[in-house]
Amino acid sequence: MAHKKGASSTRNGRDSNAQYLGVKRFGGQSVNAGEIIVRQRGTHFHPGLNMGRGKDDTLFALAAGVVEFGTRRGRRVVNIQTAE
């Protein structure tokens, strides 16, 4: 049995890129329309008032206002309270 695998063969080199997921704007912070609030895999947080959801489940603001986290029907939701 060879104890070397031969020319240009390796068992390493499989590191994946970071995904940079998580909450980007926290409760009480001011945001503008279009700003990303949460990057996530699946719907850990659900979109609430003045919030949109992208195809990769990213939550973003549809209007300028203040971020607010809460619950609705047992689900974590994110709302944007606009200054009306």
UniProtKB/Swiss-Prot annotation:
Any one GO molecular function term: structural constituent of ribosome
Q: Please give an example of a GO cellular component term from this record.
A: cytosolic large ribosomal subunit
Q: Which GO terms describe its biological process?
A: translation
Key words of the record: Ribonucleoprotein, Ribosomal protein
Disulfides per UniProt? none
Question: Is Transmembrane helix tagged as a keyword?
Answer: no
Task: Write down the HAMAP family for this protein, in alphabetical order.
Answer: Ribosomal_bL27
- Report the family membership: Belongs to the bacterial ribosomal protein bL27 family.
* UniProt xrefs under PANTHER family: LARGE RIBOSOMAL SUBUNIT PROTEIN BL27M, RIBOSOMAL PROTEIN L27
- What protein is this chain from? Large ribosomal subunit protein bL27
Q: Which gene encodes it?
A: rpmA
